[in-house]
Every structure is written in C-alpha cells, then in structure tokens.
C-alpha cells in the first residue's frame, strides 16, 4: 500500500453509523444501518478470526445499497482486504479494490477506529455495539 488506510466512525444516531474509509483507490463516506447486522461487531470478529488464520467479512448495509469488506490472511504479516459493492444485499457484487498490506497497514487502523468508537458516549438505542474498550484492547497493536 502506498498511502495509509484511514477509517473513522462518527457518533451513531437512530441506528445509523457514519463511516469514513480511505485507502487508494477507494474513498468512501457512508452511513451504515444496524437493522440487519452490526458491522462493528462483524469487524471485531473478523479481526479476531484473522488472528486465527481464518477469513472474515463485514457487511455495511446502507438500505438497500451494500459494501462488503472481505478479509483474509496472505502470510505471517500479510493481509488482504477485498472491497466490493452491490445495489442490495442479494445482488451480484462488483469489486472496487483489493488491498494488500501488513498488519500495521490494514488491521491496526481498524483496531484504532474501534477503540475510538468505544470512547463515544451515546444511548444504546442509537447503536447496539456491545464491546468495551478492554475487549478491543485484546486485539494486539502489532504482530
């Protein structure tokens, strides 16, 4: 990766989570819904799965548009993030980008964004995320 990946979550409101994601050539800004799934829960679990050499997927549902982040491990410190989109959950996916990088380049920014999200003070009716800062800190800073 030539440019660093950045991802940030903003304060959720009424079941919508504003997300900013940038990793060349992809630059996304969207609000994900919590109606069908909790994408932050999926992100946390995907990272845990990667640490155990398994794949993971995050579905960002925009009602009806959808982004998919598919994670896989490609080596001891190699990771791949495949980003695709679809007009709705059940439609065929169109690939947007395949990003290859190290833990520091691809996974650490996701961990950081989850930690920052844990610092928000909001009513749980606005978003169902149930992990604490201590839970997220179990994800290593580096491999």
Label the model's feature ranges.
Residues 71-99:
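Mid-chain, well-packed structural core segment of small domains
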Residues 5-9, 65-73:
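Broad, structure-driven detector of short, well-ordered beta-strand segments within folded domains
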Residues 12-17, 52-55, 75-77:
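A short, compositionally biased
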